[in-house]
Regions:
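Active-site-adjacent helix/loop patches that line small-molecule binding or acyl-intermediate pockets
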Residues: 125-126, 134-136, 141, 145, ...
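Peptidoglycan glycan-strand catalytic modules in the bacterial/periplasmic cell-wall system
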Residues: 46-49, 53-307, 313-316, 322-325, ...
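A penicillin-recognizing enzyme superfamily signal
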Residues: 338, 342-358, 391-456, 461, ...
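Short, glycine/proline-biased beta-turn/loop segments that scaffold the active-site neighborhood
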Residues: 256, 481-536, 610-624
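Active-site SXXK
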Residues: 85-87, 238, 348, 459-460, ...
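Short, well-structured active-site flanking segments
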Residues: 95-105, 183-186, 245-250, 499-519, ...
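Non-catalytic structural connector segments
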Residues: 245-339, 343-407
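N-terminal type II signal-anchor transmembrane helix
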Residues: 1-53, 93, 113, 359
Length: 774
């Protein structure tokens, strides 16, 4: 009987062993549950953020979506404290086992499974935890979790075969979700401590490793005391593992929990506006006519041209991975190398802040504070202002959300007038306040806006890009997406057409007011000053002084349709450009990027260079999968380009941009043009040297928000100083290799007229000019 009982036990044991072996064999081969294949094991982290780099190797930021904000780093870039804390806390015999710690597993089965000691600790190794994170779905029940365990054991053994211990630790820390969109140790170190992982202190490393047990429970932002206690548990485990002495533990455990918390998202980093513009640009889909409303046909045409001519536009949907799927900037871990220079980007952002925030904005606030219509012009009636504000309400995200939720118009408008807690932008940092959504709309309209871009005229490489004040609060990108009336900055293109049609800079024109018949109606352009009125003046003088009468005279001698065509050749694709006499005064709306690119032709022998934002793209393994080259087209002949260059240099040396010399003391050869529009609504300045073409626009969110006086509202006051401040910073940095001693490629003694020009024609200082379109 006893012998039979023993045989029975052995039979049961043998059956269990054989069944277990068969089960593990089936799991190993993927017959039971999911078993990753070799390719999957070789690249277990397949979804992580795309990194955007500057031309000088700095990380500008990342593109991510939800839990894909992950930047993978190698083991050698992690603090030794991280490694020791992780091993001591999660798997003390990590370096001794091959994926499964049988001693810890047996202890866990006896204490937790048999004796019911829930606080006895688990038996999972770091490798098993990694297998769970990578391949196990969240279990819906205890039974399902028990079934997942043996699958994770097998995966852990396979991971140990493919990877070294260091690589397993790197995988674990790169994959773990540390909360607050901090996925992976690099993002976590930056989010919680504003540091690189290799620079973490012992206490900081222990705090992050403490999250590995239960991130929500030991969240240091929400539960600092609990997180500190957990950190000290990690430190005590390091003592047990021999990584710390008792004395060191006592000293570190007494330290307070100190965070430098900053949630990381796509709005952070440098060159934010450019990164967001590129993200949408690269992810664009092939334009389909049915996706555009009838009134936006021009945009469909523009996008179609971009799709066919610019390799970067829609790049993700034009290029495909090995599996045939399109690239995704949110999850494919690409490296996008932009042409931005991080130093020049910083100088540009500083220049915009220095002039707009510290100089213009206080003056504008003082001027508008006296108006009941603030920030709008006092020419508007209360009824007109109400219409504008109501339009802003209906365009807001809050309105759209409430409308979709079924609220009535009255309920929505009542909600917009009710004060609530909110955080608003100031130049001194975000401020918590009590304000109604309607008041916040009006508040944000008080801020002057600005856009700035700088590029290399030879290669098209965009070196600096400032799309606005602060992307978190002002997401509209003025440089590429915004279009504003260009005023006098359009005149060099008119003069270029004149040169192409045989005119010379020294040809004479009557400087007087004249009425032209346009489509049977009289048109009489006005000029802001009457200097040399009634005299015959050279075209060069007319451009230097931004004289409206000379521009109108030229327009009367040229074909307006040809003018439209040459604007297109210069890369200006604004849909509201129409052939008319008044087009010579710049009433059309154009983006900063288009204007800056157009002016490259004057510094580049008549060859216009398109902006190039990206030089190359790498995949997540470091392979170059795309490179980009300059895109150029000749718009005017080289001889005429030299004529235009000498005239635009005259704008600086004796015209409306003269303050670059006498106020900002900028040296070297510079060509430029100022621009101001009706009622001082838009201030423009485009300037160029042999090495850089840069342009900026300053104005209100809407045209009725502007300075009252021309002295403050002209382009020479609003926009020119940004260019000047930027260039002074650039010239002061020898590492950039940009110098005022570099000269334009002009023949020695070049004379565009082949005849002497009077000194009066060359030098007559004018600070700025008003542009009128009537």
């Amino acid at each position: 009987m006893r012998k039979h009982f023993i045989y029975t036990l052995w039979g049961i044991f043998a059956t269990f062993v054989v069944s277990a072996m068969l089960a593990f064999f089936a799991i190993w081969n993927g017959w039971i549950g999911y078993m990753p294949d070799i390719e999957d094991l070789q690249n277990p982290i397949s979804r992580f953020a795309t990194q955007v780099y500057s031309a000088d190797g700095k990380v500008l930021g990342t593109w991510n979506l939800n839990k894909e904000n992950r930047i993978v780093i190698p083991y050698k870039k992690m603090s030794p404290y991280l490694i020791k804390a992780l091993v001591a806390t999660e798997d003390a015999r990590f370096y001794e086992h091959s994926g499964i710690d049988y001693r810890a597993l047996g202890r866990a089965i006896i204490k937790r499974g048999i004796l019911g000691q829930t606080n006895a600790g688990g038996g999972s190794t770091i490798t098993q935890q990694l297998a769970k994170q990578l391949y196990s779905e969240k279990a819906g029940s205890t039974l399902e979790r028990l079934l997942q365990k043996p699958i994770e054991w097998v995966i852990a053994i396979r991971l140990e075969r493919y990877y070294t211990k260091q690589e397993i630790i790197a995988l674990y820390l790169n994959y773990f979700d540390f909360l607050h969109n901090a996925v992976g140790i690099k993002t976590a170190a930056n989010t919680y401590f504003n540091k690189e992982p290799k620079d973490l202190t012992l206490c900081e490393a222990a705090t992050l490793i403490g999250l590995c047990k239960n991130p929500s429970l030991f969240n240091p932002v929400r539960y600092p005391d609990r997180a500190r206690d957990r950190r000290n548990v990690v430190l005590s485990q390091m003592v047990k593992a021999g990584y710390l002495s008792r004395g060191e533990y006592s000293r570190y455990a007494a330290e307070p929990l100190t965070l430098n918390f900053h949630r990381t998202d796509h709005k952070d980093g440098t060159a934010t506006y450019l990164r967001e513009y590129l993200r949408h640009y690269m992810m664009a889909k092939r334009p389909e006519r049915g996706n555009y409303p009838s009134w936006n046909y021009a945009q469909f045409v523009t996008d179609s041209i971009l799709w066919n001519t610019d390799p970067l536009y829609g790049w993700c949907n034009k290029n495909f991975k090995k599996d045939g799927s399109p690239y995704n900037v949110y999850s494919d871990g690409l490296k996008v190398f932009t042409t931005i220079d991080s130093r020049m980007q910083r100088y540009a952002e500083e220049a915009v802040y220095q002039h707009v925030a510290r100089y213009l904005q206080p003056i504008f606030n003082k001027e508008t504070s006296r108006k009941p219509s603030s920030p709008y012009s006092d020419k508007l009636t209360p009824k007109q202002i109400k219409v504008i504000l109501n339009r802003s309400i209906t365009q807001s995200e809050r309105y759209q959300t409430m409308k979709a939720a079924g609220y009535s118009e009255q309920e929505i408008h009542d909600a917009f007038r009710k004060k609530i807690d909110m955080t608003v932008f100031t130049y001194h940092g975000d401020v918590d306040t009590l304000m109604s959504p309607l008041d916040s709309i009006r508040y944000y309209k008080t801020f002057l806006r600005s856009g700035f871009m700088s590029m290399d005229p030879k290669t098209g490489a965009v070196k600096a890009y400032v799309g606005g004040l602060d992307y978190s609060h002002f997401m509209y990108d003025i440089v590429s997406l915004g279009r504003r009336q260009v005023g006098s900055t359009i005149k060099p293109f008119l003069y270029s057409l004149a040169m192409e049609n045989g005119f010379s800079p020294c040809d004479l024109a009557p400087n007087r007011q004249h009425t032209y018949m346009v489509a049977g109606r009289p048109w009489t352009p006005r000029n802001a000053n009457h200097s040399r009125y009634g005299q015959m003046v050279t075209l060069k003088w007319g451009l230097q002084q931004s004289n409206t009468w000379i521009s109108a005279y030229l327009m009367s001698k040229l074909n307006p349709q040809q003018f439209v065509q040459i604007l297109r050749d210069f890369g200006i694709n604004s849909p509201d450009i129409h052939a008319s006499m008044s087009l010579c005064l710049g009433p059309c709306e154009v983006s900063v990027s288009e204007m800056v690119s157009a002016y490259t032709a004057f510094a580049n022998h008549g060859i216009r260079t398109a902006p190039m934002f990206v030089s190359r793209i790498e995949d997540n393994e470091g392979n170059t999968i795309a490179t980009f080259q300059p895109r150029m087209n000749e718009v005017i002949g080289a001889e005429n380009a030299m004529k235009m260059l000498t005239m635009l240099m005259g704008v600086v040396d004796g015209g409306t941009a003269g303050r670059l010399r006498y106020r900002y003391n900028l040296e070297g050869q510079i060509g430029a043009k100022t621009g101001t529009t009706n009622n001082n609504s838009d201030g423009w300045f485009i300037g160029f040297t042999p090495q850089l073409v840069s342009g900026c626009w300053v104005g209100g969110e809407e045209r009725d928000i502007h300075f009252d006086t021309m002295s403050m509202g002209q382009g020479a006051t609003m926009a020119l100083p940004i260019w000047a401040i930027f260039m002074k910073k650039v010239y002061a940095d020898p590492s950039l290799g940009i110098s005022p001693t570099v000269k334009f490629d002009l023949p020695d003694g070049y004379d565009p007229c082949h005849k002497p020009v009077s000194e009066q024609d060359d030098f007559e200082q004018v600070d700025g000019i008003d542009e009128v379109f009537e």
